[in-house]
Amino acid sequence: TSKYVKKADGEVEIPTYFQSEFSKDINNFTVDELKAKNEAAEKFIESEEEESAVLLKNDNNALPLSKDEIKKVSLFGYTTVMPYYRSHSGGGGSQRTVSFLEALDSRDFSYNKALIAAYKELKLERNFKTIAEAPVSIYTNSVKDTFSAYNTAIVTISREAGENDDLTLNYADSDRTTHTILALNKNEKDMLSLVSEYRKNGTFNKFIVLLNTSNTMEVGWLDDYGVDACLYIGGPGMSTGFYGVADLLTGDVSPSGKLVDTYSTSSLSSPAMRNFGTISTKNLIYAEGI
């Protein structure tokens, strides 16, 4: 295959398939060009998070948080210290990864250090077969005593999957029940019940949920636990996406994304579920109108 293109006047030239705005030679960046490219990429990743996040619920304008409210935040969920950045599909990465806590620090949030310390003592495994959430026993009386000083509750919930890493329909929970992994597990329910209790008794002024997942979870529980606001943040990426999450919480930017999937109260309510799973019969009746 020729690397040259013949022009109308008969002369030939080497075609330019992509002209980078950072370098004339994308295979040989200078140090300054590489720095400029990386800075632009980080800004793009942050803006992608800001423009893709979806506000699923916002009762009584619970979001955005005021300047006073971001100084008194209690962060719940093991995902707070072990965020979900991207799915298992594909590759890519970044020379630096900004965590959720680092992003909050950069925007002058003050949060409950007792909660963070309790989560960091745990070593939980999270993958497409497991749900990594702390047991309610970590919220000791000494931890609960700190809630009144940090009266804005932000709960982060995550699921992790990707290509060839499908989430299971038969998750074996610690209470011996079996359910889809898109539903809450016992530890998550216990945590949400605890936050709901302190929201009802007036200790917490707001109850915010962040869905840090690329998978479509069941969300009927948002009403069950009295959640004030819920923000879908997806996977913010392996770089600066969590800066965007922090800015969404403060209202410096507005969530402008739209859902491409239906967030149902039960994933089993879809008509397609009647034909889902391992089919052992030789004949199958198709039911989608073929």
PLM features: what roles do these ranges have?
Residues T1-I290:
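C-terminal non-catalytic regions of proteins with extracellular/luminal or membrane-system context
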